[in-house]
Amino acid sequence: MTEASEINLSDIKGPIDVNTPITNHRTALIQNYSTKPKLTYQTVFGVNGPLVIVHNVKFPMFNEIVKITLPNGQIRMGQVLESSKNKAVVQVFEGTTGVDAKFTTCEFTGDIFRSPVSLDMLGRIFNGSGKPIDKGPPVLPEDYLDINGQPINPFNRIYPEEMIQTGISAIDVMNSIARGQKIPIFSAAGLPHNEIAAQIVRQGGLVQLPGRNNETVNFAIVFAAMGVNMETARFFKQDFEECGSMDNVCLFLNLANDPTIERIITPRIALTAAEFFAYHCGKHVLVVLTDMSSYAEALREISAAREEVPGRRGFPGYMYTDLATIYERAGRVKGREGSITQIPILTMPNNDITHPIPDLTGYITEGQIYIDKQLHKRLIYPPIDVLPSLSRLMKSAVGEGMTREDHSDLSNQLYACYAMGKDVQAMKAVVGVEALSPDDLLYLEFLAKFEKNFIAQGRYENRTIVESLNIGWELLRIFPREMLKRIPETLLEKYYKRKKQ
């Protein structure tokens, strides 16, 4: 086999297959290591937080990448946030510690931030800037892609219709996730959102139905951590290794002791890799982003350093638009085999769902999975509260041919009974058990069994969709048939067969 070092790119002549790796790599080299003259300045005017202000710059361009060389020779990367006639405001991804206004030099490259991508990135661990930190060799890039991605034409989007089976009943039956959907996990500090996300990653796959051709899928996972502690990063890495999926996982880790400003580019680099796996390699990619609250706080820090007019709780007014540039990169595209499904995790400050971060996230994404503190206190795992949880694409991913014909009606009836049980429980605290009617007592019984048998399950318990639906019917048999108003008579005839006492 010919060594890569022996290949002279200038010796390749004649027609070239554009799909060969050597051609892709040659194109990437020409594109990124151009010999255009670059401009270097030693005119740093000042440093403000994560920002460096450079004066007397000729034609600075918005989003242009800047190489900043410190007096000790260390090189850091930055990006132009604001440009005027002869001034540029540069955000430094690795932080501004050690930047000397007199001796620091800035090289304006004239290009945007492009991330090297390759199929070899699977099974590797990178820092928040996309550099390997697993003591492995550098990745040989197949291409260099803009980290901001390319906007998908809405006409070319495919509506998500294939349900992902997570093995968790509270999600599969009540809040079904479709392939290509973006659905966040709303949690709070101290709740097991990491364990739930790891279980979804471990057990996630297409619905396996008896009598149907259940093909194996080309699956990959991209995990991006922003501002997490070492314990969280180690938990996910260990979980991926134990379940044997580490070869299909690409990890990007920005830890709590890493520069805050780096959190701005970490999710974008991760999604650029995911888009390459999905749209160029035909893989079905699941992207887990944690913690989006840390990302939003980094955004607020930059906004404060630029002295912009703050919005609610000090967050910038453009945070909605900025979050949308991340969340909207999920989906499916016509003519491409792969898909991107996003599960962002965000911890709500003070468990407040009206906080700007979960509030704006809920506007953009297609539903949410809500982790409840009260269920967690009662040792129910996973503590998913099905009432505020929602999946807006569930209606197109369930039903006959996809899951089972009773799925939608069964879910509606379980919702109604659980909500009624909650109302009766609140009323019982006021008037006492003696004042409750026989129907109210049935709702209380259903409430207890629903949380114990349906919501609660083991961390490694993988229920099929059929098993979860059957558990739902077992619970509804608590009620007489005439009380189940939301299920058609034909389905009751088929599935409601009450055992004789």
From Swiss-Prot:
Signal sequence range: none
GO CC terms of this entry: cytoplasm; proton-transporting V-type ATPase, V1 domain
Disruption phenotype: Spermatogenesis is arrested at the primary spermatocyte stage.
UniProt keyword terms in alphabetical order: ATP-binding, Cytoplasm, Hydrogen ion transport, Ion transport, Nucleotide-binding, Transport
Protein origin, superkingdom: Eukaryota
Tissues and organs where the protein is expressed, per its UniProt entry: Predominantly expressed in male and hermaphrodite testis (at protein level).
Localization: Cytoplasm
One matching Pfam family: ATP-synt_VA_C
CDD domains per record: ATP-synt_V_A-type_beta_C, ATP-synt_V_A-type_beta_N, V_A-ATPase_B
Ion transport is among the record's keywords: yes
Phenotype for D172N: In eb30; reduces self-fertility at 25 degrees Celsius which is almost abolished at 18 degrees Celsius
Residues the entry annotates as binding ATP: R392
InterPro entries named among the record's database cross-references: ATP-synt_VA_C, ATPase_a/bsu_AS, ATPase_F1/V1/A1_a/bsu_N, ATPase_F1/V1/A1_a/bsu_nucl-bd, ATPase_V1-cplx_bsu, P-loop_NTPase, V-ATPase_su_B/beta
GO BP field: ATP metabolic process; intracellular pH reduction; positive regulation of programmed cell death; spermatocyte division; spermatogenesis; vacuolar acidification
Keyword Iron: no
GO MF terms held by the record: ATP binding; proton-transporting ATPase activity, rotational mechanism
Subunit structure: V-ATPase is a heteromultimeric enzyme made up of two complexes: the ATP-hydrolytic V1 complex and the proton translocation V0 complex. The V1 complex consists of three catalytic AB heterodimers that form a heterohexamer, three peripheral stalks each consisting of EG heterodimers, one central rotor including subunits D and F, and the regulatory subunits C and H. The proton translocation complex V0 consists of the proton transport subunit a, a ring of proteolipid subunits c9c'', rotary subunit d, subunits e and f, and the accessory subunits vah-19/Ac45 and vah-20/PRR.
HAMAP family from the UniProt entry: ATP_synth_B_arch (MF_00310)
Family: Belongs to the ATPase alpha/beta chains family.
Protein task: Non-catalytic subunit of the V1 complex of vacuolar(H+)-ATPase (V-ATPase), a multisubunit enzyme composed of a peripheral complex (V1) that hydrolyzes ATP and a membrane integral complex (V0) that translocates protons. V-ATPase is responsible for acidifying and maintaining the pH of intracellular compartments and in some cell types, is targeted to the plasma membrane, where it is responsible for acidifying the extracellular environment. In neurons, required for necrotic cell death probably by promoting intracellular acidification.
NCBIfam families (alphabetical): PRK04196.1, V-ATPase_V1_B
Protein name as annotated: V-type proton ATPase subunit B 2
Lineage: Eukaryota, Metazoa, Ecdysozoa, Nematoda, Chromadorea
